[in-house]
Design a protein with these regions (language model features):
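Glycine-rich NAD(P) Rossmann-fold beta1-alpha1 loop
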Residues: 132-133, 161-168
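Residue-level marker of beta-strand positions
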Residues: 85-86, 105, 176
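Surface-exposed amphipathic alpha-helices with a cationic face
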Residues: 167-176
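Residues at the starts of beta-strands that form the adenosine-phosphate
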Residues: 6, 86, 180-181
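NAD(P)H dinucleotide-binding glycine-rich loop of Rossmann-like/cofactor-binding domains
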Residues: 90-158
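Glycine-rich beta-strand-centered segment in the early N-terminal region that forms part
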Residues: 25-43, 54-94, 100
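Cytochrome P450 core scaffold surrounding the K-helix E-X-X-R motif
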Residues: 46-52
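Adenosine-nucleotide cofactor-binding segment
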Residues: 175-219
């Protein structure tokens, strides 16, 4: 691959915030000991905020956003990875503090990477992305609490925000794990979608309006 490649660059000069796809070279990439050819990235809520400069999440400009990506190692100074390894990155404030995945080439700390499982394509990894990772960790936490603290199997699980990215994947995972999933959503047009994912019951979000916000999460 040429030393020049395309990346989405966001910049802030005074009150002027810009987004532009530009050609850059590898000298632009600041941090990391592993260089990756990015195959896929995705779009998360935090990405949307960063792309609109919401929440002032990015402190240094110019910047390359994109909190997730999958790809193939081009160069490595990290003993854990070698050229040709297929890898996944999610989290570690990449795309926020460190340059992210909205680029044809990325350079990151090898400790942020994991090797891609052989039964998962790079595209599938990014279809799941941060939302899938978060949902799975939540499901594991429910299972752990069930086994360690409750002493008996939990039957019913309530998923709020069920039609969103994290929520919809959580509905699918939890139903596959054998739980009766009660999906809360304010979008009636998503009812059939949630049923197809495995929700046993759909609850209108309005039923929770006015209730105390001091409810504790199970995870």
């Amino acid at each position: 691959m040429s030393d020049q490649f395309k990346a989405l660059i966001i910049n802030q000069e005074g009150e002027n915030f810009t987004r532009e796809v530009k050609k850059i070279d590898r000298s632009f990439l600041k941090h990391g000991d592993v260089t990756i050819k990015v195959d896929y990235s995705d779009l998360n809520f935090k990405d949307g905020m960063i792309l609109k400069n919401g929440g002032r999440l990015v402190k240094e400009f110019p910047h390359i956003p994109g909190i997730d990506f999958s790809g193939t190692v081009l160069e490595s100074d990290n003993s854990k990875f070698k050229e040709g390894d297929e890898v996944i990155l999610t989290g570690f404030r990449v795309g926020e503090v460190f340059y992210g995945g909205y680029s044809q080439i990325a350079k990151v700390n090898g400790d942020f990477l994991v090797k891609k499982p052989k039964n998962l394509t790079s595209k599938q990894a990014m279809i799941l992305g941060t939302a899938g990772f978060t949902s799975l960790m939540s499901a594991f936490a429910i299972k752990a609490r069930e086994e360690l603290l409750l002493g008996e199997k939990v039957k019913d699980v309530l998923v709020t925000g069920a039609s969103g990215g994290v929520g919809s994947i959580a509905v699918m995972i939890l139903s596959k794990m054998g739980y009766d999933v009660h999906a809360v959503t304010g979008k009636k047009d998503k009812n059939d979608y949630l049923k197809d994912l495995g929700a046993k019951n759909i609850i209108d979000r309005k039923e929770f309006e006015g209730e105390s916000k001091d409810r504790k999460s199970v995870v």
